[in-house]
Amino acid sequence: MKQILILGAAALVFAATPAGRVTAPIAVEQMASINVGDMAPDLAFPDPSGKTRKLSDLRGKVVLLDFWAAWCGPCRMENPNVVRVYNQYKDAKFSTGKGFEVFSLSLDNTKDRWIEAIAKDGLVWPNHVSDLKGWRSEGAALYGVNAIPATYLIDGKGKVVAKNLRGAALENALKAMQAK
């Protein structure tokens, strides 16, 4: 009977997991929640060379804050779309700023796999950061990230204007934000 209860509980957890996302082993109540309309909390983490990069240094540009990991299949499948959109909009003029940047916060635990994934997926933007703490990343906790990929679209004034945009939805949001 005990095995049936355990299997039933496992099935419920599996059924509640959104398709195409990898979930965190952290209780949701331990995490913050950043919503559309909130000011984006600042993040400061090392890049692969050890230099600290801050999200706030990109103020004045539209930013996609992208939580991902080298081991996350859905994240890696979305990367070609993010690269395409980055190349298309990096110099665009928006109503709240000029230019589009990606701030990639990796939830990897190992630096080598993280750097290898950046190169293999052709992630050409300069803002790759990680504290290499995996799901225990302070950035993930601050933003309430409990599944990846997770994205926050931030306008040039630092306000979150959309969450979890993927595929064509990201490009459509950027088009709508362009200066008229």
Placement of each model-derived feature along the sequence:
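Alpha/beta-hydrolase fold active-site loops
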Residues: 62-63, 100, 149
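Short, internal strand/loop/helix patches
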Residues: 103, 108-110, 115-152, 156
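Thiol-/selenol-based redox modules, centered on thioredoxin-like
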Residues: 148-180
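Bacterial Sec-dependent N-terminal signal peptides
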Residues: 1-27, 180
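Conserved helix-turn-beta segment immediately C-terminal to the redox Cys motif
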Residues: 77-104
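Short active-site neighborhood of thiol/selenol oxidoreductases, capturing the structured segment around
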Residues: 54-76
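N-terminal "domain-start" segment that seeds a small globular fold
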Residues: 22-56, 173-175, 179
